Amino acid sequence: MLIQAVTIFPEMFDSITRYGVTGRANRQGIWQFEAVNPRKFADNRLGYIDDRPFGGGPGMIMMAPPLHAAIEHAKAQSSQAAKVIYLSPQGKPLTHPKAAELAELPHLILLCGRYEGIDERLLQTSVDEEISIGDFVVSGGELPAMMLMDAVLRLVPGVLGDMQSAEQDSFSSGILDCPHYTKPLEFQGMAVPEVLRSGNHGLIAEWRLEQSLRRTLERRPDLLEKRVLIPKESRLLETIRQEQREIQS
């Protein structure tokens, strides 16, 4: 997989290309990265790529021509079709299913905005999709781009040492992950649940499912409204709800 970022701050991406599981996978050649600086495509000696907005208003707007040239340069680096994504609070929310969809693609170009935004004409002519990481605003698109990259790359075969890690993550199955424990057996008076030390894999699997459902019901009940429950899940969920009703009464 080739991922390119159109950014005026290429150095920011060192954190994902050099460190952790994504950095290791990059060194192993499982995925490749290139930062494309639109300043190199500016039509002025100083590399300005922004100007004042027509109609007035605060801040500066990134100009379409240098960004368009940077995107076209990025596309030319691969013979495979690229999907151009603009990281924007106005985009559709990034979800696990969307990350899984993007993980299947061979070439992504991530457009990282700065200042007050990007000329609308560039978005209409050169961007395939706008994606948001949440209902809040940050100073630029680089951090959202790296969050998207991390979510996507975890689902690319070979990036994680064990793909089961990705399969057990929160949201991968549509519900939140269960609690996890390791040594020591006791910490500040709290012991590891006995079932996890029993060696009974069937009981452990059922406990983890029950805990995932319990946590999802408490923290993200909206996820359960979207999920088609299998009979075992329905049974466990009804038991949890009955417990809650008894506590409240």
Curated annotation (Swiss-Prot):
Disulfide links within the chain: none
Reaction equation(s) it catalyzes: guanosine(37) in tRNA + S-adenosyl-L-methionine = N(1)-methylguanosine(37) in tRNA + S-adenosyl-L-homocysteine + H(+)
UniProt binding sites for S-adenosyl-L-methionine: 113, 133-138
First-tier enzyme category under EC: transferase
Keyword tRNA processing (UniProt): yes
Protein role: Specifically methylates guanosine-37 in various tRNAs.
Subunit annotation: Homodimer.
Family according to the record: Belongs to the RNA methyltransferase TrmD family.
Protein name, UniProt field: tRNA (guanine-N(1)-)-methyltransferase
Natural source organism: Neisseria meningitidis serogroup A / serotype 4A (strain DSM 15465 / Z2491)
